[in-house]
From Swiss-Prot:
Domain-related comment: Contains a UvrD-like helicase domain.
Family in the record: Belongs to the helicase family.
Pfam families recorded: UvrD-helicase
Record-listed ATP binding positions: 35-42
Native source organism of the sequence: Bacillus cereus (strain HuB5-5)
InterPro entries in the cross-refs: DExx_box_DNA_helicase_dom_sf (IPR013986), DNA_helicase_UvrD/REP (IPR000212), P-loop_NTPase (IPR027417), UvrD-like_ATP-bd (IPR014016)
GO MF annotations, alphabetized: 3'-5' DNA helicase activity; ATP binding; DNA binding; hydrolase activity
Gene Ontology cellular-component terms listed: cytosol
Protein name (database record): Gabija protein GajB
UniProt site positions, description: Interaction with GajA: 256, 259
GN (gene name): gajB
Length: 684
């Protein structure tokens, strides 16, 4: 088995689906290209791009036109660029980078949309202050007292944030004299903070709105930067989700912009369409509709697979409801896995796409399903480390259901445990932790995880001798007018940071920041942190504000203690977390969440499975119990079944050669269904 000898008749048959894409390209006919896991979707995408270059290069260059290819991740962007080769005709990027490229030059229109966003936010904040729960003490005040209270708090913003993480008694003491006329306001410090935070936001947004209206310098353009995963609307800065909102609004509203995009980019490809935000699909639909209206040509091609839709924010099978009239082209050949793996994933998928290997030498893989207990996990892994001759060059990839296990086995258990205790990620928000702390897609990291990632990346880049100076910050203009000596001094300043823990490292940054007067140095630090005038206390309070929003008096000590845990984690552990996010782990056994393997492929895969997943205690058992008769399911149960099926399909289809599954709960009630899928169930 080497998966190298392509059967000529299969190659010829596969080419028919590729030719169908070419035919639609020539006719400017929108398509959905569905291909199962390992089918060579990227190959088909590359071939389509090459076809356009071969046949339309002269015309594209004459009309100053280009091809857009939107990928789901930066890793995919890199892969497409490498496989496509050097060309200026194709713009390959993630959706956020491309969306910004399409709209960033229309600042007048963007500022108007930003102004509308501010209006909505201002209205929402006023509503909270006037009628919201938790704001009652402010609502009880007379209008003149409300105005005076706002004035006092705005003038004492620094004092407020200095005491943000302090105990209730200390907060009351700090504001006792200032708020002498407001005896009821400090009775509940949690509500006091909630009210004041709303006042500060309202003040910032109102000033920004006014400055836009007055056409003041600094308020004439909107900025998007991929490093931040949070909006700072009052600074005219937007993040990922808001960028897509603005993109949809501006393209929907302005026909001239639609025509400019259509005429400049007559070919648009979207990779992994099933995981793409609905707003992007809407934009594409508007473009195609308008192209038909003005009788201009545009080709829009969606490449992906609805059976691999595993993210809640992806459009999935709803795509045809949003963008109608698309031609469907399916591909059934598998270019990744052995015959043994393909047979299993076909049974899991169980739809119109039944894959066969494109290769003649596709036999020789192995699939086994074990039943056991959690106590068997370590022994199973050890067995296959020996049997499969696992090394750092021939790694074993183990998929586990819980973030806790991934974090523990990957070396950053303390980071995970600390974040799990925050209000942001506990209770009903627990499932967010999977994506916002462990995602390899940086745009999906939570606001605070992304902030810590930026800091650890800076630390990593400073100690890594292979990192270029430019990689320390994307703001290349910082270095334009700097001498070599100035550059050396800047790097020397940055390398002064010391500290065994994250907290000590941040304190070190804060100390240097307060002592030096180097404008470029401060720009790099401000850019890394996302805010200015860095102090250790400000940083701690920022973490509390974001991870324990509107905490009550009784919770201040708990919040402070949890933030302290985050700060006391060894910087080396943060380095291991950084490697996990960047997919640069070097161990023999690599641990993943099920979701974290999307788009990947591995020779050797072990999947640990149980009934429960997250807060759902009847997850995979529900799927297996209904596997033979899914048609009887309706509504939420049907949607849940499809979601679980997709996740299992994605997970099992990562395997190239060897696949093992260990189910660590009792399978008696659905063992026959497992046998239908995997052939046999072996006791471990």
């Amino acid at each position: 088995m080497s998966l190298s000898k392509i059967i000529p008749s299969n190659k010829k048959e596969e080419q028919k689906s590729i030719n169908a894409i070419f035919n639609s390209i020539d006719k400017s006919e929108g398509i959905i290209f569905n291909s199962g896991a390992g089918a060579g979707k990227t190959y088909a995408l590359i071939e389509s791009l090459k076809y356009i270059i071969r046949n339309y290069e002269k015309s594209l260059k004459q009309h100053n036109q280009q091809i857009i290819c939107i990928t789901y991740t930066n890793v995919a962007t890199k892969e497409v660029k490498e496989r496509l080769g050097n060309t200026d005709l194709v713009l390959v990027s993630t959706i956020h980078e491309r969306m910004w490229g399409l709209i960033k030059d229309y600042q007048k229109e963007l500022v108007e949309i930003h102004k509308e966003k501010l209006e909505d936010e201002i209205s929402s904040l006023k509503q909270k202050l006037e009628k919201g729960q938790g704001y009652e003490k402010f609502q009880e005040l007379e209008e003149d007292l409300k105005g005076n209270f706002k004035k006092i708090m705005i003038e004492n913003r620094e004092l407020f944030f200095q005491n943000y993480s302090a105990k209730a008694a200390e907060v009351k003491k700090s504001f006792k004299i200032l708020l002498n006329d407001y005896p009821n306001m400090l009775k509940n410090v949690g509500n006091f903070k909630r009210i004041v935070n709303a006042i500060y936001k309202l003040d910032q947004y109102s000033k920004c709105y006014e400055n836009i209206s007055l056409n003041k310098q600094g308020y004439k353009s909107v900025e998007y930067n991929s490093i931040y995963n949070n909006d700072q609307l009052y600074k005219m800065r937007i993040s990922h989700d808001t960028l897509l909102d603005y993109g949809l609004k501006i393209i929907k509203k302005y026909d001239l912009l639609k025509q400019i995009i259509i005429d400049k980019y007559p070919f648009i490809f979207i990779d992994e369409y099933q995981d793409t935000d609905e707003k992007v699909i809407l934009i594409m639909s508007y473009l195609e509709q308008y192209a038909k209206k003005i009788d201009h040509k545009i080709f829009i091609g969606y490449f992906g697979d609805t059976a691999q839709n595993i993210y809640d924010d992806g459009v999935g099978s709803e795509i045809t409801k949003i963008h109608s009239g698309l031609k469907q082209i399916d591909k059934v050949f598998n270019r990744r896995s052995t015959k043994e793996v393909i047979e299993v994933i076909n049974k899991i998928r169980n739809d119109s796409i039944e894959q066969i290997s494109i290769y003649d030498d596709c036999e020789g893989g192995s699939v086994k399903f074990y039943k056991g207990t959690s106590g068997n996990v370590k022994d199973l892994i050890e067995r296959y480390i020996y049997e499969w001759k696992i090394t750092t060059e021939n790694q074993l990839h183990c998929l586990v259901l819980t973030n806790k296990i991934v974090a523990e086995y990957s070396g950053f258990k303390n980071i995970y445990e600390a974040f799990k205790e925050t209000d942001k990620y506990k209770g009903s928000n627990y499932n967010q932790l999977n994506t916002e702390l462990l995602s390899n897609d940086l745009s999906k990291l939570g606001e605070i995880p992304k902030l810590l990632f930026n800091i650890v990346r800076l630390q990593n880049n400073l100690v890594d001798k292979t990192t270029s100076v430019i990689d320390i910050t994307p703001k290349e203009s910082l270095f334009d007018e700097m001498s070599i000596e100035g550059l050396r001094n800047l790097i020397k300043l940055l390398k002064q940071y010391q500290g065994k823990t994250l907290g000590e490292y941040i304190e070190s940054i804060s100390t240097v920041y307060s002592q030096v007067n180097d404008e470029n140095y401060k720009k790099i630090i401000d850019w890394t942190f996302g805010f200015e005038n860095i102090t250790f206390e400000l940083f701690k309070n920022h973490l509390i504000e974001k991870l324990f929003n509107n905490i009550l008096d009784d919770d201040v000590d708990r919040a402070t203690a949890t933030i302290q845990k985050i700060l006391e984690v060894d910087i080396v552990e943060y380095g291991l977390w950084y490697k996990f996010i960047m997919d640069k782990q070097e161990e023999k056994v690599i641990y993943h969440t099920y979701h974290g393997t999307k788009g990947r492929e591995f020779d050797n895969v072990i999947i640990i499975m149980e009934n429960a997943f997250g807060r759902n205690h009847n997850y995979f058992n529900f799927f297996f119990e209904n596997f033979l008769h899914p048609d009887v399911l309706e509504g939420e149960k049907k949607l849940n079944f499809e979601k679980i099926k997709n996740l299992l399909y994605v997970s099992c289809s990562r395997a190239i050669k060897n696949l093992r599954v260990l189910y660590i709960d009792d399978v008696t009630d659905f063992e026959s269904e497992i046998k239908e899928m995997f052939g046999e169930v072996y006791p471990f």
